[in-house]
Amino acid sequence: MALRFILGRAGTGKTRLCLEEIRKELRQAPDGPPLVFLVPEQATFQTEYALALTPGLSGMFRAQVLSFRRLAWRVFSEVGGAARPHVGDVGKRMMLARILARRRNELRLFGRAAGQYGFSGTLAGVLSELKTYLVTPEALEQAVRMLPGTAETDSLQAKLEDLRLLYTDFERELAGKYIDPDDYLTLLAARLGESPTLRAAEVWVDGFAGFTPQEYAVLEALLKAAARVNVALCLDPRSGRREDLELFQVTRDTRARLAELARKNGVELERPVELAGPPARFRANPALAHLEREFFRRPTKKFAGPPENLRLVAAASRRAEVEGAAREILRLSRERGWRWRDVSLVVRNLADYHELVATVFADYGIPCFIDRKRPVRHHPLVELIRSALETVTENWTYDPVFRYLKTDLVPVSRGDVDLLENYVLAHGIKGAKWADPEDWHYRRSDALNRPVPNGTGAPAPSDRDRYLREKVNRIRRRAARHLLDFQRRVQAAGTVRELTAALYDLLSDLDVPGRIEEWSREAETEGRLEAAREHRQLWDGVVELLDQVVETLGDEALTPEEYGRILDSGMDGLQLALIPPALDQVLVGSLERSRNPDIRAAFVLGVSEGVLPGRHGGTGLFTDREREVLLAAGLEVAPDTRRKVYEEQYLVYIALTRAGHYLWVSYPLADEEGGALAPSSVIPRLRELFPGLREETLALEPEGTAPGADLPYVTAPGRTLGFLVTRLRDWKSGVTVDPVWWSVFNWFAAHAGWRERCAPVLAGLFYENREPRLDPELTPELYGSRLVVSVSRLEEFRGCPFAHFARYALRLKERDVCRLAAPDIGLFFHAALKTFEDRLREAGMEWDALESADCTRLASAVVEELAPQLQSEVLLSSPRLRFLTGKLERVVERTAGVMAAHARHSRFQPVAVEVAFGPGRDVPGPAYPLPGGGSVELAGRIDRVDVAHTDNAAYLRVIDYKAGPRSLALDDVYYGLNLQLLVYLEAGLREAAALAGRECRPAGAFYFRVQNPLLKGGTPVPPAEVAPRLLKAFRLQGLVLDDPALLRLMDDAIGSESAIVPAGLKQDGTVKKKPGVVSAAQLERLQEHVRRVVAETAAEIQAGVVAIAPYRKGQANACRYCAFKPVCAFDPLLESNRYRQLRALTAGELWRLLGLPEEDEPGDE
C-alpha cells in the first residue's frame, strides 16, 4: 500500500506521465495485475481513446479507464451489493413528489412550495448534495440542536427540520427495496476492500482539483486496498510565492487531506514526482508560457513585444463573438492544417452559448460536439405522452388533442391534421363529440346574419361539402382510434401499474419504437449522428422511466391527473448524456466539465464580469450565510466562500492554460436584449501583462471599406453568401464597400452549384415589393361585370388597395374559429335591438312609453331567443360564456332604457330598422357613374332610420349601432377612410319616400354605442344624477346640422350642452361651434366629396389597382390590425414600401380643400 503524488503546473505533462507509466506496464506485462486510471466522468472516453491509440500495444486487458461511478459498478459486479432495483433521478423525483404530497401539511417551511411544479426536483438535488457530503438525517437532527436559538437561525432551523423529515421518509422508502445512485460511492467505500481485482491493482488518479467527502471515502478505501495509488495534482511543487500558494490552494488542500488519510491508515507516502521544469506544453510559445507563469504573480512582469498566438477580442454581441470564433477556427484549420479535434471551445455558462454555437458552427460547416446533458421536453415522444394524458384528463379539449396529433407519431399526415384542425376549430368540437359513433354533421352558419333554416327546407349540402364531411370523418376516426382505446384503459385502471400498462399499450399500438428507430436511421443517413443517438436514448429513457414508475409506485391508487403530474415531473428529469459521436470534432463545453488533453487551440468565450471568475450566491435551498452557520455547527454541506474564491482563481488558470499553441479570449459587449456587459477582471490583467497585445473589436456584420478589410468574413460559402447580400445592399444604398466582395460575387457566379443558390438571394436585392395593376381582362372575372360594393369594402380599399384585393379578389380569410369575438358581439347587439324593436311593434308599444320593467322583460326574452343562434351556440358552450350572456342581457336592457329616454326627449322616432339597400334588397342603393363609363352601386344595411315631422318639413337621420367607442373625424371622411355615415344618410334620403312616406331633409348621421357604462367618480353618484349621467354616456356621435330648431327636435331639453347629440346652444340661441356640427352647405359639400371618392375608388378597383400602399395618419395605420400582412410582406424598411402619409386636417383646412370659406375652429364655447 503506497501513495505517490505527481505534481506540476499546467502543461508540465502530468497526464502524459500517467499514460506513459500505464503503457510501460502494459508493454512489460500485458497479463499482469490490473491498472486503473481514475478520471472524471466526462474525460473517460477521451482518455480511453488516447490509451487505445498507443502504438505497439499487444492488448489493453490490464488497463481500465474508470470514473468513480464506473468503478462502483465494477466493484459491485465482483462483490455484490447492488442487486436491488436502482432508483434514478426520475424515480427519486416521483418518490419525493409522493412524500411531499403526504407530508405537505406537516412541513414548517416547505408546505407551500411542496405543491409547486418542479420542487421535487429541487429537493432531489438537495438530498443528493447531502449524500455527497455524507450528511445523514441524524446529522441534520444534531445540527438543529447545535444551532443557536436566534431570529437569524429560525428559518434555517425550520428548513433543517423539514429536510430531516423528508430525508427520513425517503430513506425509509428505499430501505431494503431500492438503491439510490447517490449512495453508490458510500457503498463502494464500504465494499471496495472486498474486491480481489483492486487488492493488487495500481491506480492513477488524474483530472481532479478536489474531491467530495464521498470521493475521499472511496480514495481512503483504495489506499488501503490497492498496491499503489498515484494522484496527479496541478500545483507548483517548489514555489513558495504567496500568489502561487493561493492559486493552487484547492489542490494543496487536496494533497494535504490525502496525505493525512495515508498516514491515518498506515499507507506509505512515497517521494512525489515533481515536474518542476518549464511546462512542455508551452515550449514553442513564449507568450503562453509567460501567461501561465505570470498571470497571478505580482509585481507584473510584462511581456516584451507583441504576443504571437494570443488574441483578445471584444465582440458586439454573443453571436458576433461565436461567429468570430468560428471564422478563426476555419482559418486555423486551413492555414495550419489542424484537425477539428485539436480545437476546444470553453465557456463558463454553457446555457448562454450552446444554441448559438450549434447554429453558427453548422452554418460554417464546423463539426462540433457540445458536452452537455440534453433536456428532452422538446421531443415529440415526450409531447405525445404528455398530450395523450392531458387529452383524457381534460376531456378532449382542443390544445392537447392537436399537440398529440402533431407529434408525427400518430398515423395521420400533417395535411390531414390541418384539415381536421380547421374543421374542429370552426365548429367548436370537443369532449364527447370525439367519441360519437355517428358521423359529424356540423354546418357552419351564422343564424343572426345569414340564417340557415333547420329541418325541412334547409339547403342541401353541395358535393364539396359532402366530400369534405366524409373526408373529415375518416380522418377523425383514424386520429382518435388509439386515443379512445387509451381513454378506455385509463378509465378502467385502478393502480399506477395499470395506468402505466395503458400508456405502454398506446405507445405499442402507435408503433412508437419503430417510428423512433426510423427517425434514428434517417438522422444517421443525413449525418446527424447526435440526433440519431438522441432518438434511441430517449426511447430507452422513457421505457426506464415507466419501469421506475411501476417499481416505485406500482400498486398505489392514483387518479389519472395525479399520475400525469408525477409522470410529468419524471419526464422533466429525463436528460440525455451523449458521448462524442465522431472522433474529429471541435469539443465545446463548460469550463468545469471539459477535459481536453493535447489540444492545440483553446477558445475561451464569454469572459464577462461576474462570469469568469464567477460571483457566488446561495444555490439550492441554502444561502451562503446558512452554509457558514451550518459549518460552524459541524455540518459541511458545500465549500465555504473562501474556498469558492480559490476555486474561481483556479478555473481562470485552467481556462488560460488549456492549449499549448494558440489562445483566444473574448467577451461580448452586450447581451441579446442590447444590455451592456462589462469585461471580466481577466481582460485588464491580460492587457497589463501584454502591452503589445492588440485588442480586436468584432462586429456582427462586415463594415470595411478599405481593400481586404472584410477578408476575414470570407470563409464558409453559406455564411459568406449572407454577408455578400448585406454588403451589396450597402453598396446599393451608396455606401463604399471593400472590393473583395466583387471577387466573392464572381466566385459564386462561377461555381454552378452555388450559382443556383445565389441567384434568388441576390435577386432579392433588386426586388421591389410592388404589385402591378391587374390585366384589364382579369378584373371583371375577379369582381364581376357589374360593380356592387359595400361601404366597408370601399373603406378597405382606401386604407390599402392590396388588402381589398386579398379579401375580395383572392377571397382570403382567417380560418373560422368558433369563439366569441368583438364582431360577433356587435352582430349580436344589432340583432338584439332589431328583435327588441319588432317585439315592441308586435305589442303595439312605443319607445317613449317604455318602462324599466318592460326593458328588463323584453331584453331577457330577446337574449334568450338569440343566444342559441350565435356561432353554433357558442354562448351556451361554457359556464364563462353563459355568464357573459347575462352581461349581454344587461347591456341590451340598459341600451333599451336609454333609447326610451331619447324617445321621450325627442321628436325623432324610428321609421325603419335594419334597412338593407342595394340590388334586390329592401330599397335601391345609391349608384354613381364612373369616369371611364359604367357605374357603381352601393349596398349596405342601415341600423335605424329616424324621422321627425314639423308643419313645413320632415327631417331624417340615420343611426349606426356600435359595440365599441366610435367617433367621426371629418378628415377621415375626406380621405375616404370613413364613408359609412355619409353614404347611409344619402341612401336614406334617396329612399325617404319609401321609408317615411314623404321626402325628407337631412338632419344628421350618428353612431350609437351599445353599452352598459360604468359611471366613474371619486364619490358615490347621487341617485338624482344617475339618469342624466347615463344619457351623457350614451350621447350620439357624428354629424348634426347647425339648426337650433332642428336640435330642439332632437333634444327638447337642450341647453349649453345636449345629453343626446354632440351639440349645444349659446345664450343667444344660436348653435355652438363643435367638431360634429356642420352647416347645410358644408354637409352638401361633404356629400358631393363622398360621391366623388366613391366613384374614384370604384374606378380604381375596376382598373385593377392592387398596390401595397397602406395609409398612415398619426399613430393610426392600415397594417395595425390587418390579417394579410404575411401575404403582402410589407416592410417599411424597403425603399419600395412606404406608408401613404395622410396629414391630419383642421376643420379650416378641410373646408378650404372642399372649396368653402374657412370658419373659426370649432370649440366648446
UniProtKB/Swiss-Prot annotation:
Domain UvrD-like helicase ATP-binding: 1-298
Keywords assigned by UniProt, alphabetized: 4Fe-4S, ATP-binding, DNA damage, DNA repair, DNA-binding, Exonuclease, Helicase, Hydrolase, Iron, Iron-sulfur, Metal-binding, Nuclease, Nucleotide-binding
GO biological process, one term: double-strand break repair via homologous recombination
Recorded superkingdom: Bacteria
Cofactor(s) recorded in Swiss-Prot or TrEMBL: Mg(2+); [4Fe-4S] cluster
UvrD-like helicase C-terminal domain location: 279-584
Cofactor note text: Binds 1 [4Fe-4S] cluster.
Gene3D superfamilies recorded: 6.10.140.1030, P-loop containing nucleotide triphosphate hydrolases
Residues at which [4Fe-4S] cluster binds: 800, 1119, 1122, 1128
Alphabetical list of Pfam families matching this protein: ADDB_N, PDDEXK_1
Sequence positions that bind ATP: 8-15
A single GO molecular function term of this UniProt record: metal ion binding
Keyword Acetylation: no
Xref: HAMAP family: AddB_type1
PANTHER family xref list: RECBCD ENZYME SUBUNIT RECC (PTHR30591:SF1)
Subunit-structure text: Heterodimer of AddA and AddB.
Family label: Belongs to the helicase family. AddB/RexB type 1 subfamily.
Note in the entry: Despite having conserved helicase domains, this subunit does not have helicase activity.
NCBIfam families tied to this protein: addB_Gpos
Function summary: The heterodimer acts as both an ATP-dependent DNA helicase and an ATP-dependent, dual-direction single-stranded exonuclease. Recognizes the chi site generating a DNA molecule suitable for the initiation of homologous recombination. The AddB subunit has 5' -> 3' nuclease activity but not helicase activity.
Protein name, entry field: ATP-dependent helicase/deoxyribonuclease subunit B
Organism: Desulforudis audaxviator (strain MP104C)
Lineage, uppermost ranks: Bacteria, Bacillati, Bacillota, Clostridia, Thermoanaerobacterales
Gene name, Swiss-Prot/TrEMBL: addB
